[in-house]
Amino acid sequence: MPTLKIRGAELYFDTYGEPVSGRDPILLIHGSYITGSVDWSGVAPRLAQEFQVIVPDCRGHGRSDDPAGRYSFREMAADAAALIRALGHKQAHVIGHSNGGNVALVTLMEHPDVVASCIPQAANAYVSADLVERIPKKLDPERVRVEDPSLMMEMIELHSARHGVDYWATLLRRTAAEIVSEPNYTALDLARVQRPTLVIEGEHDATNAPAAHGRFMAQHIQGSQLWIPVGIGHNVHTDAPAAWCERVLEFLRAVPALQRH
């Protein structure tokens, strides 16, 4: 089982493919309360035909521990940067989905030296009022236990072996607390970005489309691209994997390799 000690946590990760000369690897960051393999197994093999792909379980998720209980986008972004370096890479193409998209964005903002390019999908640069209103109710463990027991059982299956059978409720509470707190980037903050960026947001993403978070990021990150797939919701890469891979690989092929920067 491949693991590395990263900033006090034992992080599990999978790799797909071998290093490709002249091409930085891809780092895929999973979304809320799931794992890397659950989120990315449908697209990682296709990406690995052209790039090496690294897929970790974020701290406190799946097979990665979190002994200090430090759940935050900033902590996970620092982990991402440290993992890239620990694996011997100077940079990686950092792609994230949902809360993983937030982690990808924070990695871009706080650790730009390790980012060759960034693809935040279904992410938000700031905490909008609708998130504060909806998320604590949606992720309340008692509501989930009664109204969405399948989610509870999935979380128990994914996380209990490493973290205990009751950990799912703790993870939901930590996730909700972070979503209504971070990130908090302004238009001026985003204007500082100097890395190629592709923002992805499904047309019908119920989490982020109402506040037009994707458009906000793309509007203020200089030179960024925005892809809004028509008729798709929060999970573009699983709902339309072929189209997603085609668009992402088209973008990545155009990113100059590190040695040509």
Residues covered by each model-derived region:
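Conserved HGGG/HGGXW glycine-rich cap/lid loop of the alpha/beta-hydrolase fold
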Residues: 9-63
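Acidic beta-to-alpha connecting loop that harbors the catalytic carboxylate
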Residues: 32, 203-206, 231-233
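Active-site loop/oxyanion-hole signature of alpha/beta-hydrolase fold enzymes
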Residues: 41-48, 54-95
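Flexible "cap/lid" loop of the alpha/beta hydrolase fold
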Residues: 102-110, 114-151
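Active-site nucleophile elbow and catalytic-triad environment of alpha/beta-hydrolase enzymes
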Residues: 173-189
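Short beta-strand/loop motif that positions the catalytic acidic residue
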Residues: 193, 199-201
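Conserved alpha/beta-hydrolase "acid-adjacent" motif
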Residues: 206-213
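Catalytic active-site module of serine/aspartate enzymes centered on a nucleophile-bearing elbow/loop
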Residues: 224-261
